[in-house]
């Protein structure tokens, strides 16, 4: 059976972010690294005890029937690993006839480890989406825009990447996502989301934080990112305030921290 995320590609707009076929069920989906995407307080579902081990006669063993409707949905959720936050995936495809806000497409939200991997395995990696496109992953109800109330006083850590390796680009983006949904930072409450920009000369990954004046939080997040992403000496992390980015572009934007 195809997942809900795969069926969604038939009506999502735009369609170019989805793979053309569902992954083989024989291959399975990759397991999230425990260091980055450990679920928050996963519920413990214990197996039923063997009546012979408990000493109870087999005839007294209660029989159960599969739940239906809403009960089935709730039961299924017990076997998933919940995340601490609900996250929303956005996709932007460049269209000069539309405003920036209208180009942003809210795709879907998820709140478990399993639903994250189901979504991730059915969309194209960043290296395969169109030039001028963006993926954004933000906490639910935060739009990937400077003007959003949750973002306008904040800033972002920016990693600029050359075009040499598609694999490195895809792996780096996945590691960023796992850091976000796995709450890998001491100041995870300051995290708003992350964006990857696919452009002609270079690509950018940015991690957005809520308060650009919170130096302690910004630096802790920056150092954790550098360690988690295993960035080399040629890849610097630069922290920029959104208010500066809104009035200047490219290399003209002042960086208040560099790691």
UniProtKB/Swiss-Prot annotation:
Biased composition (Basic and acidic residues): 41-51
Gene3D superfamilies attached to this UniProt entry: RNA Cap, Translation Initiation Factor Eif4e
Biased composition (Low complexity): 54-70
UniProt modification remark: Phosphorylation increases the ability of the protein to bind to mRNA caps and to form the eIF4F complex.
Keyword Ion transport listed: no
GO biological process annotation, one example: translational initiation
One Gene Ontology molecular-function label: eukaryotic initiation factor 4G binding
Effect of residue 107 to A: Abolishes interaction with cup and mxt
Any Pfam family: IF4E
Disulphide-bonded residues: none
Coiled coil: none
Primary role: Recognizes and binds the 7-methylguanosine (m7G)-containing mRNA cap during an early step in the initiation of protein synthesis and facilitates ribosome binding by inducing the unwinding of the mRNAs secondary structures. In 0-1 hour embryos, forms a complex with me31B, cup, tral and pAbp which binds to various mRNAs including maternal mRNAs, and down-regulates their expression during the maternal-to-zygotic transition.
Name listed for the protein in its UniProt record: Eukaryotic translation initiation factor 4E1
Species of origin: Drosophila melanogaster (Fruit fly)
Lineage, top ranks: Eukaryota, Metazoa, Ecdysozoa, Arthropoda, Hexapoda
């Amino acid at each position: 059976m195809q997942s809900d995320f795969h069926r969604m590609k038939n009506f999502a707009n735009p369609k170019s972010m989805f793979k053309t076929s569902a992954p083989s069920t024989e291959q399975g989906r990759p397991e999230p690294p425990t260091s980055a995407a450990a679920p928050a307080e996963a519920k413990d579902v214990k197996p039923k005890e063997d009546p012979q081990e408990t000493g109870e006669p087999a005839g007294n063993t209660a029989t159960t029937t599969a739940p239906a409707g809403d009960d089935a949905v709730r039961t299924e959720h017990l076997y998933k690993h919940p995340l601490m936050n609900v996250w929303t995936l956005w996709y932007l495809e460049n269209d000069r006839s539309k405003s920036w806000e209208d180009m942003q497409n809210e795709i879907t939200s998820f709140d478990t480890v399993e639903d994250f991997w189901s979504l991730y395995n059915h969309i194209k990696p960043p290296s395969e989406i169109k030039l001028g496109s963006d993926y954004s992953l933000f906490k639910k109800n935060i739009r990937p825009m400077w003007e959003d109330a949750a973002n306008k006083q904040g800033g972002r850590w920016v990693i600029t990447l050359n075009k040499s390796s598609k694999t490195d680009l895809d792996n780096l983006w996945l590691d960023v996502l796992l850091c976000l949904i796995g709450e890998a930072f001491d100041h995870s409450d300051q995290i708003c989301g992350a964006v990857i920009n696919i452009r002609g000369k270079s690509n950018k990954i940015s991690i957005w934080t809520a308060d650009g004046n919170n130096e302690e939080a910004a630096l802790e997040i920056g150092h954790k990112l550098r360690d988690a992403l295993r960035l080399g000496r040629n890849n610097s992390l630069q922290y920029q305030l959104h208010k500066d980015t809104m009035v200047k572009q490219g290399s003209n934007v002042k960086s208040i921290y560099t790691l």
